[in-house]
Amino acid sequence: MLAISRFRVAPDRAVDFVERARAAAAFFASRPGCVAADLLQNLDDPQLWTLTSRWADVGSYRRSFSGYDAKLVLVPLLSEAIDEPSAYADPAEVGENLPRSLS
């Protein structure tokens, strides 16, 4: 399972963002089931960043959000992410992927 959270970060906020995003990547990396967690910057648009993590399974990813430390490190940062779907899995694991109802 792959989780990709993208961020648009103004240059004057980059230093603070990188510090918080590195802490989030380290937090993810310390959680059971996390295969890798990386903070990456776009090659063409320096204001575009991603926090990308790979997980053994979706359950491990979801459990990484449990607990007080997760609320302190992950939630404030991820609330700044671009609002778009962020979780991906092998199509065989996903099955028929139907959009959620907006009503």
Please report, for each region that a protein language model flagged, where it lies by residue.
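Short, flexible segments with low predicted structural confidence
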Residues: 1, 15-16, 32-33
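Short, well-ordered beta-strand segments in beta-rich or mixed alpha/beta enzyme
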Residues: 2-7, 38-65
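Short, surface-exposed ligand-recognition loops at beta-strand->loop->(often short) alpha-helix junctions
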Residues: 8-19
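Intrinsically disordered, low-complexity segments enriched in polar/charged residues with Gly/Pro
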Residues: 13-15, 26-27, 39-41, 74
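Residue-level signal for secondary-structure boundary sites
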Residues: 13-15, 59-61, 93
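An amphipathic, aromatic/His-enriched active-site/gating alpha helix that lines ligand/cofactor pockets
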Residues: 26-35, 54-87
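Glycine-rich beta-strand-turn "strand-cap" elements at beta-sheet edges
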Residues: 38-47, 73-103
